[in-house]
């Protein structure tokens, strides 16, 4: 009994251990055993375990092909992702999980298919009643093709059914179709065609995947019984209106197109409406009009002829048969049709040159605007008016001219009496310049006339001039210089266009030699007033300019008044003064010398050592004069037999060892431009005493001192006066005695 219990206990222990192990480590796979995946979709295979903290996973196909997917393991779960699913994913996949020494494995079969779109219904052409047409039902991109079945229904009636079991399956996507030919009838309108495709993916599953397309039948009938109605009539007058209506039968309802048959048989499309209305009919509107009914399966047409009868009309053109237009202005040519409601206009030049203007048509009037007018616009213009089948033309001649500005007078320089001058009369921007005449007049006298007719004209604006040289005189002042320009027209105007410019002549006369008045005298005494007055004749009146001539010959301007005044003259005012008369015609000048004289009280006659000397003494007689230019000093000794001029040095005369015969009257004469002055003194020479050998020492010393001091004093006085007084004269020169 105990042995049996032990055996039972041991067996139960082993079973418990096995049960515990089986509970501790399990593997599961999802989806289970088998799954379907559509090509292009995403597929997840999940392998998970229980009873193991850190299992390891591995995936493989049963035939060891590539997985063609991505594996992601997290803890006790591993996922194989196939994105997108392709043919390479059709396998049996095995997931192996290992936990320590234990290993478990699960497998799953992945089958793939492709059935992504609804079938398509295609027709070989439009469904026209009574005409056979082929309809095709297509199932695109299918796999496996051997499990496909296609059915085609018209309404509830099965037209055809087809499967593809006999076709060899391929590892590829295929498009299969079912084709049926049938003849549409009127009763098919609004019926539906149904194309149904079935894919039996799992042979054990009797329910297939199914897709279908439904298309309502659009049945057509070709247009027929096309008819035209015309109101009011097919025969019309110019300016009248007509309405034509067209109708046609067919399915779908035909579109109506109106055309006109041209002379060459070509149809000119006019309208896409059932009703065609023509207003203000013209002659050219006559003809055959065609109505055509058109739909997808056919067309039907009919025609009608309209006859439009003409009526007379005239054309007027303004402003006339000829018009003159200035360059830069605007001119409007107007062409009007009378008796035609809807005329058509065209403009051209007689030489078929380009039109440079703007054409505007409004009703029965057409205008051609030339703005701005240029020389290229000079043409004969033709306006052609078409009224139905009739044409009329009118011509207008446009003459272009340019004469925008008055002439310009240019003179080569100022007008000076007796001096030749060139006058230029310019006429700017003239056209046509070969019709230009230029005349130059002085007062009422024609100086020169020129007609440019002989020059070759060009199609451009040109500037022309007339030039001449004449010598103006003083008598021309106040006269008018006139430049007269005339532009002659060819035929349009009897009188030429005129422009003129006038310039009053003012002839300049150069200043004559000035006249100078000096009051009271050109040699006044120092301190007295002096007025220098100048005048000069000329035109315009000369301006007066007083200047002083410097030692270097240059002129120092002093005044622009006619009178130059000195209130109190000074010695330095002496000099040459120049008066200039100045105007635009020239300069004239004259000079005068002003000499300022010193007063006579400055003359002194002295003797050294005294007027009474002894025989043998040295005597110095001196004559001096201050602040007097141009002075002559003459020392003389009066005698009964005649005056004896003494040879003086700087106004001094020295008697060495005076003798009794040296006694007498000595005279100093000073001469200037205004007169002379005299000074005199008497020298007394006494004879020696008995002791002839006696010579006083004091007298000897005095003699030597005087011989040195007196010349020194004279030199000092000379240089001082020369330095302080401008214009003073050296007494050295005064020794040149004048008798």
Curated annotation (Swiss-Prot):
<dbReference type="GO" id="GO:0060384">
    <property type="term" value="P:innervation"/>
</dbReference>
<dbReference type="Pfam" id="PF07679">
    <property type="entry name" value="I-set"/>
</dbReference>
<dbReference type="GO" id="GO:0035094">
    <property type="term" value="P:response to nicotine"/>
</dbReference>
<dbReference type="GO" id="GO:0050839">
    <property type="term" value="F:cell adhesion molecule binding"/>
</dbReference>
<dbReference type="GO" id="GO:0060669">
    <property type="term" value="P:embryonic placenta morphogenesis"/>
</dbReference>
<dbReference type="GO" id="GO:0060326">
    <property type="term" value="P:cell chemotaxis"/>
</dbReference>
<feature type="transmembrane region" description="Helical">
    <location>
        <begin position="699"/>
        <end position="720"/>
    </location>
</feature>
<feature type="glycosylation site" description="N-linked (GlcNAc...) asparagine">
    <location>
        <position position="273"/>
    </location>
</feature>
<dbReference type="GO" id="GO:0005886">
    <property type="term" value="C:plasma membrane"/>
</dbReference>
<comment type="function">
    <text>Cell adhesion glycoprotein predominantly expressed on the surface of endothelial cells that plays an important role in immune surveillance and inflammation. Acts as a major regulator of leukocyte adhesion to the endothelium through interaction with different types of integrins. During inflammatory responses, binds ligands on the surface of activated endothelial cells to initiate the activation of calcium channels and the plasma membrane-associated small GTPase RAC1 leading to leukocyte transendothelial migration.</text>
</comment>
<dbReference type="GO" id="GO:0045177">
    <property type="term" value="C:apical part of cell"/>
</dbReference>
<dbReference type="GO" id="GO:1904646">
    <property type="term" value="P:cellular response to amyloid-beta"/>
</dbReference>
<dbReference type="InterPro" id="IPR003598">
    <property type="entry name" value="Ig_sub2"/>
</dbReference>
<dbReference type="GO" id="GO:0060710">
    <property type="term" value="P:chorio-allantoic fusion"/>
</dbReference>
<dbReference type="GO" id="GO:0071944">
    <property type="term" value="C:cell periphery"/>
</dbReference>
<feature type="glycosylation site" description="N-linked (GlcNAc...) asparagine">
    <location>
        <position position="561"/>
    </location>
</feature>
<feature type="domain" description="Ig-like C2-type 3">
    <location>
        <begin position="223"/>
        <end position="309"/>
    </location>
</feature>
<feature type="domain" description="Ig-like C2-type 1">
    <location>
        <begin position="25"/>
        <end position="111"/>
    </location>
</feature>
<dbReference type="GO" id="GO:0005178">
    <property type="term" value="F:integrin binding"/>
</dbReference>
<keyword id="KW-0964">Secreted</keyword>
<dbReference type="GO" id="GO:0060945">
    <property type="term" value="P:cardiac neuron differentiation"/>
</dbReference>
<dbReference type="InterPro" id="IPR047012">
    <property type="entry name" value="ICAM_VCAM"/>
</dbReference>
<dbReference type="InterPro" id="IPR013783">
    <property type="entry name" value="Ig-like_fold"/>
</dbReference>
<dbReference type="InterPro" id="IPR007110">
    <property type="entry name" value="Ig-like_dom"/>
</dbReference>
<keyword id="KW-0945">Host-virus interaction</keyword>
<feature type="domain" description="Ig-like C2-type 6">
    <location>
        <begin position="514"/>
        <end position="595"/>
    </location>
</feature>
<dbReference type="InterPro" id="IPR036179">
    <property type="entry name" value="Ig-like_dom_sf"/>
</dbReference>
<feature type="disulfide bond">
    <location>
        <begin position="534"/>
        <end position="579"/>
    </location>
</feature>
<dbReference type="GO" id="GO:0010212">
    <property type="term" value="P:response to ionizing radiation"/>
</dbReference>
<feature type="domain" description="Ig-like C2-type 4">
    <location>
        <begin position="312"/>
        <end position="397"/>
    </location>
</feature>
<dbReference type="GO" id="GO:0007157">
    <property type="term" value="P:heterophilic cell-cell adhesion via plasma membrane cell adhesion molecules"/>
</dbReference>
<dbReference type="GO" id="GO:0032496">
    <property type="term" value="P:response to lipopolysaccharide"/>
</dbReference>
<dbReference type="GO" id="GO:0071356">
    <property type="term" value="P:cellular response to tumor necrosis factor"/>
</dbReference>
<keyword id="KW-0677">Repeat</keyword>
<dbReference type="GO" id="GO:0050901">
    <property type="term" value="P:leukocyte tethering or rolling"/>
</dbReference>
<dbReference type="GO" id="GO:0001666">
    <property type="term" value="P:response to hypoxia"/>
</dbReference>
<feature type="domain" description="Ig-like C2-type 7">
    <location>
        <begin position="601"/>
        <end position="682"/>
    </location>
</feature>
<dbReference type="GO" id="GO:0035924">
    <property type="term" value="P:cellular response to vascular endothelial growth factor stimulus"/>
</dbReference>
<feature type="glycosylation site" description="N-linked (GlcNAc...) asparagine">
    <location>
        <position position="531"/>
    </location>
</feature>
<dbReference type="Pfam" id="PF00047">
    <property type="entry name" value="ig"/>
</dbReference>
<dbReference type="InterPro" id="IPR003987">
    <property type="entry name" value="ICAM_VCAM_N"/>
</dbReference>
<feature type="signal peptide">
    <location>
        <begin position="1"/>
        <end position="24"/>
    </location>
</feature>
């Amino acid at each position: 009994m105990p042995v049996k219990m032990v055996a039972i206990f041991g067996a139960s222990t082993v079973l418990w251990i096995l049960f515990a192990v089986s509970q501790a480590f399990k593997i599961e796979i999802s989806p289970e055993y088998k799954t379907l995946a559509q090509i292009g979709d995403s597929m997840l295979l999940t392998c998970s375990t229980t009873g193991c903290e850190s299992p390891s996973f591995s995936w493989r196909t049963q035939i060891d092909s590539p997985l063609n997917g991505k594996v992601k393991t997290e803890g006790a779960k591993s996922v194989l992702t196939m994105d997108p699913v392709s043919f390479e994913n059709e396998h049996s996949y095995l997931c192996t999980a290992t936990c320590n020494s234990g290993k478990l494995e699960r497998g799953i079969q992945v089958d793939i298919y492709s059935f992504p779109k609804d079938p398509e219904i295609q027709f070989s052409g439009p469904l026209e009643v009574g005409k056979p047409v082929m309809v095709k039902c297509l199932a695109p991109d299918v796999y496996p093709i051997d499990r496909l079945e296609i059915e085609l229904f018209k309404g509830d009636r099965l037209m055809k059914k087809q499967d593809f079991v006999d076709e060899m399956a391929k590892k590829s996507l295929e498009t299969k179709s079912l084709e049926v030919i049938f003849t549409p009838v009127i009763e098919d309108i609004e019926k539906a065609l149904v194309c149904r495709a079935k894919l039996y993916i799992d042979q054990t599953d009797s329910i297939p995947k199914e897709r279908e397309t439904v298309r309502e039948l659009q049945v057509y009938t070709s247009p027929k019984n096309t008819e035209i109605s015309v109101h009011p009539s097919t025969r019309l007058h110019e300016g009248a209106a007509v309405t034509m209506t067209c109708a046609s039968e067919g399915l779908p309802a035909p579109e109506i197109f109106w055309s006109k048959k041209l002379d060459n048989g070509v149809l000119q499309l006019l309208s896409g409406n059932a009703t065609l209305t023509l207003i203000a009919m013209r002659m050219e509107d006559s003809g055959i009009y065609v109505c055509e009914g058109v739909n997808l399966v056919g067309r039907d047409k009919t025609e009608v002829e309209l006859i439009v009868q003409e009526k007379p009309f005239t054309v007027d053109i303004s402003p006339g048969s000829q018009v003159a237009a200035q360059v830069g202005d605007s001119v409007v040519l107007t062409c009007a049709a009378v008796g035609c409601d809807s005329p058509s206009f065209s403009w051209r030049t007689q030489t078929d040159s380009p039109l440079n203007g703007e054409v505007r048509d409004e009703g029965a009037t057409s205008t051609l605007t030339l703005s701005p007018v240029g020389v290229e616009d000079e043409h004969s213009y033709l306006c052609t008016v078409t009224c139905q089948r009739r044409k009329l033309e009118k011509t207008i001649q446009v003459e272009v001219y340019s004469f925008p500005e008055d002439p310009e007078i240019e003179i080569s320089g100022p007008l000076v009496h007796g001096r030749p001058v060139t006058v230029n009369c310019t006429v700017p921007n003239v056209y046509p310049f070969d019709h230009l005449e230029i005349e130059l007049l002085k007062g009422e006298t024609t100086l020169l006339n020129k007609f440019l007719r002989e020059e070759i004209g060009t199609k451009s604006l040109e500037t022309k001039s007339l030039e001449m040289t004449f010598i103006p005189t003083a008598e021309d002042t106040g006269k008018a210089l006139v430049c007269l320009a005339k532009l002659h027209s060819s035929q349009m105007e009897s009188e030429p266009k005129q422009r003129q410019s006038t310039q009053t002549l003012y002839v300049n006369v150069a200043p004559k030699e000035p006249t100078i008045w000096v009051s009271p005298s050109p040699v006044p005494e120092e301190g007295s007033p002096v007025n220098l007055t100048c005048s000069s004749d000329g035109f315009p009146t000369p301006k007066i300019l007083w200047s002083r001539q410097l030692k270097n010959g240059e002129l120092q301007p002093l005044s622009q008044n006619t009178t130059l005044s000195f209130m109190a003259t000074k010695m330095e005012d002496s000099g040459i003064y120049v008066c200039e008369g100045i105007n635009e015609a020239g300069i004239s000048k004259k000079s005068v010398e002003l000499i300022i004289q010193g007063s006579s009280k400055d003359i002194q006659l002295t003797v050294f050592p005294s007027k009474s000397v002894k025989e043998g003494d040295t005597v110095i007689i001196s004559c001096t004069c201050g602040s007097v230019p141009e002075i002559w000093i003459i020392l003389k000794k009066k005698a009964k037999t005649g005056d004896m001029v003494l040879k003086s040095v700087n106004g001094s005369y020295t008697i060495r060892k005076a003798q009794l015969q040296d006694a007498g009257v000595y005279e100093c004469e000073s001469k200037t431009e205004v007169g002379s002055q005299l000074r005199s003194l008497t020298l007394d020479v006494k004879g020696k005493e008995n002791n002839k050998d006696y010579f006083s020492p004091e007298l000897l010393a005095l003699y030597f001192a005087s011989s040195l001091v007196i010349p020194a004093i004279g030199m000092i006085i000379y240089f001082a006066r020369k330095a302080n007084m401008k214009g003073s004269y050296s007494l050295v020169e005064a020794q040149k005695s004048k008798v």
